[in-house]
Amino acid sequence: EESDSEGNNFIYKRRQNGSGAHIGGITAELKLGIPDIFDVQLGYTFQKSQYVEPEQWSDDIEAQRTMFRAPDHYGYLNSNFYITKQLRASLFGTYTGRMLVQHAAHTDIMGVEHPDTEVVTPSFWDFGVKFGYTFRLSDTLRLELNAGVKNIFDSYQRDIDMGAGRDSAYIYGPALPRTYFVGIKLSM
């Protein structure tokens, strides 16, 4: 914390690049299908992300090599099932494994002060489903009506900070709650 000549106080938070990192892992992907019946694509990644030297981001927390916001496990699924020539069902989603995140000192909505901490997040399954029906308007023009649900399991961060003293960078997990949608697609 510093003060200027007029007595105004300023708090500076400074970050600098670390000593380097070692990141390694393996990814497996699979794609299969039968034309006009179904297609499925899925992938899984296992990785390890560590700093070369232990990093310390807070005087209250012991230095460590584990990288923040870098899950060791994650995966995805994209699939389509062609029920009829016009009707298609899609299942899609992602898996994000547990990860270590920083939770900076903050004051909650009750006025209670909390010190810097590190949190291991839960894992998240973020799946959705979509149904689409295509109308053939002419030899070259198609109209698709679709509807679905994103984040079916309503996976989200349960410990979100609130209030003026919150740690606004303490965000993890799926960006949207369970969301229903409808759409129209015109293609040639």
What function would you assign to each model-found segment?
Residues 1-15, 61-63, 111-114, 166-171:
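Surface-exposed loop/turn segments flanking beta-strands in extracellular/periplasmic regions
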Residues 6-105, 156:
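Gram-negative outer-membrane beta-barrel transporters
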Residues 65-188:
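Conserved C-terminal beta-signal and adjacent last beta-strands/turns
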